[in-house]
A protein has these predicted regions:
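Structural alpha-beta junctions
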Residues: 149-154, 263, 330-333, 386-393, ...
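General beta-strand structural signal in soluble alpha/beta enzymes
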Residues: 155-160, 178, 245, 268-269, ...
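N-terminal ligand-binding/catalytic initiation module
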Residues: 1-236, 375, 429-579, 586-587, ...
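Flexible inter-domain linker/hinge segments
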Residues: 311, 648-663
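Core active-site phosphate/anionic-ligand binding loop and the adjoining beta-turn-alpha structural block
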Residues: 294-513
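Short, charged/polar "capping" segments at the starts of alpha-helices
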Residues: 275-277, 404, 540
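Catalytic or ion-translocation cores adjacent to nucleophile or general acid/base/metal-coordination motifs
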Residues: 205-229, 233, 239-242, 246-308, ...
């Protein structure tokens, strides 16, 4: 397809003539059939809802086709309308646009749907099994059309993938406001998602999937590297560490690369051969093993030789854990990144049942499938418990492993009624990073030029090294890890999709790096605008009692004021787009999370937006964490108040335990 044809296709939106039906591409990793949950009348409603995107002249042709999709796949994806052009993040100037900010958003959307990046690209799923950009291809086409037409005096409103329309606003307002899965709390159970999504009225946006901010597995590589590094430090000793986990999907696929960067032997189980081979072909995992005998031998050899290597076991994770326990292999670090936020719809596959049979069972015999999953979790936990008794440090990686294992009746609870194992936020990420404002800051070079990315890496390194000279002792370790990360980033070949980078930085670091980028754009040192953003998995963006806010102990870990305030505050301080989601990470109904994107172009407006918005985006969460009496956050917010005129935060007073105990003796 020529550039002119691409531009015409974007501008057309819903085509005037029906495109030809497309052949189902079996070389692409597809989403499993979803649960058949709708009644006969609800299926008619789903069909009526889908057809409202199209003129009447198409209805007679599309109605049976969409009905067949609903019966075959459990959703109406509108495959016929999937564009025939290649999906990837093009340089910003290749998109038809009246607003440069809108063109940047188009680039970010296409990156989320790139087949090299997305988990189920033809079903518009970026990662996590159900993390959707849109619900169907009509929504994609309309959104791209609107973005190509809009000006900086308009805002596009997005309801769970559906473009409500373009509304008049002003240049300092967000260009796009996104909500995903915002349902009434009483209707936020997993089956409510299944029903609403099948009806075409809501979607699960995960975190960066539905907010157009995914940068491929690099995003999670950095967080996983930091987690594994610090977990290894907790374990101590100078032996070669063995790290065992599961999942090679859109997010979990980062684990082998993170293991290599952290300098360990890693073994990652993955049930889906397509996913495992994809990561191997991309160079994100070194070895594939399908035979447990050969794998065990390879593990022993690598540990003995102290050879850093990443291995993938193409099979069920329970078989792996049980074999490790049976062989008395010493595992130093253990975790799990299966998509247990979505346990009944392809996020976790039970032991003893093939991938194909599981996909059939979850759609046709959902109750039996649930029983198999829960039985599998009980066996997995039993094997993990045996290995932790022999010295393994196990941590929950925020995927609802502990939560779903407890619901399955596994031996996962301690004597105090709390989980036997910590979440990684409780033990590592929370007290060492989030409490001090360090989180997953990221940027994308809209030129698509690797040279621009190299320039940003150099600038970020210079900023962090300068900060380190005057840093307090409690954050020097965090700065050192991130300086090392950014210096090695190019060598580690982390880019998949757009020219993007991530590093963990605090409020001061993010602001100084962004201002330095903006100055470099102004000078022409960086050739085109840069998109700033972050994962929702951050200091302020997410309220999640089993992950991001699991180290909040004042009882407010189940409250979502922080995440909601964050997106509101970002929206009027300079964000180019904002999003707020139900779910993300731990699952639908368990989390409220939000994010932003900011296009900086070398202007004074960008300078102002950087200073105002990034300060709020980080310090909102530090303030909340300090009120929860987290010591690191109290220290961090005191430093910020000294640094920032006009910032006044309410600080907690500490009560002597004896006074409390005396009052309730």
């Amino acid at each position: 397809m020529t550039k002119e044809q691409f531009i015409a296709d974007i501008r057309a939106g819903i085509p005037e003539t029906l495109p030809e039906p497309q052949i189902y591409d079996t070389s692409i990793n597809h989403a499993p059939k979803r649960k058949d949950i709708l009644t006969a009348e609800e299926k008619k409603l789903a069909l009526r809802n889908a057809l409202r995107y199209f003129p009447k002249k198409f209805h007679a042709t599309l109605a049976p086709e969409f009905a067949n999709e609903l019966e075959t796949y459990g959703r109406i994806y509108m495959y016929r309308f999937r564009p025939t052009y290649e999906m990837y993040a093009r340089p910003i100037d290749e998109y038809p646009h009246k607003s440069q900010q809108a063109a940047a958003i188009m680039m970010m959307i296409q990156n989320n749907l790139d087949k090299a990046v997305a988990q189920h690209p033809h079903e518009l799923i970026t990662y996590g099994g159900n993390g959707a950009v849109f619900q169907n291809w009509a929504q994609y086409r309309l959104v791209m059309k609107y973005l190509s037409e809009m000006t900086d005096e308009q805002t596009l409103v997005m309801y769970s993938g559906h473009p409500l329309g373009l509304f008049p606003s002003h240049k300092n307002a967000p260009r796009v406001v996104v909500t995903n899965g915002m349902v009434i709390p009483n209707y936020s159970k997993p089956d409510d998602w299944e029903r609403n999504n099948a009806l075409g009225v809501s979607q699960y946006g995960q975190m960066t999937a539905g907010s157009y901010m995914y940068i491929g597995p690099q995003g999670i590589v950095h967080g996983t590297t930091i987690t594994v590094l610090n977990a290894a430090r907790k374990v101590g000793g100078d032996n070669m560490k063995l790290f065992v986990t599961a999942g090679l999907g859109g997010m979990s696929g980062a684990q082998p690369k993170a293991g290599n960067i952290a300098g360990v032997v890693s073994v990652t189980a993955e049930i889906n051969p397509l996913a495992a081979r994809k990561r191997h072909e991309q160079g994100w995992v070194d070895e594939l093993h399908e035979n447990l005998d050969e794998l065990i031998s390879a593990i022993r050899k690598a540990v003995e030789e102290k050879r850093v290597v990443s291995m993938a076991y193409v099979g069920n994770v329970v078989d792996l854990w049980e074999r490790l326990a049976e062989e008395n292999i010493h595992v130093d670090l253990g975790s799990d990144q299966t998509s247990l936020h979505n346990p009944w719809a392809g996020g976790y596959y039970p032991v003893g049942v093939s991938l194909e049979e599981s996909n059939r069972m979850m759609a046709e015999e959902p109750e039996l499938f649930k029983e198999k999953v829960q039985e599998s979790l009980r066996r997995q936990v039993a094997a993990i418990n045996k290995l932790t008794a022999d010295g393994m440090y196990f941590f929950d990686y925020g995927n609802a492993f502990l939560l779903e294992s407890s619901r399955a009746g596994a031996d996962i609870m301690g004597e105090n009624g709390k989980f036997r194992y910590p979440s990684y936020v409780q033990d590592i990420m929370g007290p060492m990073f989030f409490d001090y404002g360090f989180g997953p800051f990221r940027w994308v070079c809209s030129s698509g030029d690797p040279k621009d990315l190299e320039t940003t890496d150099r600038i970020a390194t210079e900023v962090l090294e300068e900060m380190r000279k005057t840093a307090t002792p409690d954050i020097i370790g965090q700065l050192d890890d991130n300086i090392h990360w950014i210096k090695e980033a190019g060598k580690n070949k982390l880019v998949v999709g757009s020219q993007a980078r991530i590093l963990y930085a605090d409020s001061e670091g993010r602001t100084k790096i962004a201002l330095a980028f903006n100055e470099a754009i102004k000078r022409g040192e960086i050739s085109r605008p840069v998109v700033l953003g972050r994962d929702h998995h951050d200091v302020s963006g997410t309220d999640s009692p089993f992950r991001e806010t699991s180290n909040i102990y004042d009882g407010s870990q189940f409250c979502a004021d922080m995440a909601v305030h964050n997106v509101i505050g970002d929206s009027f301080r300079g964000a180019t787009w904002v999003s707020i989601h139900n779910g993300g990470g731990v699952g639908w109904g368990e989390v409220i999370n939000g994010g932003f994107g900011m296009v900086i172009d070398g202007s004074e407006d960008s300078d102002r937006h950087i200073r105002q918005m990034l300060l709020w985006d980080v310090n909102n969460g530090i303030s909340r964490r300090s009120w929860a009496r987290n010591k690191g956050s109290i220290d961090a917010i005191k430093r910020e108040m000294e640094r920032t005129p006009g910032l006044t935060v309410t600080l907690p007073n500490f009560v002597d335990d004896n006074i409390i105990n005396e009052a309730y003796k």
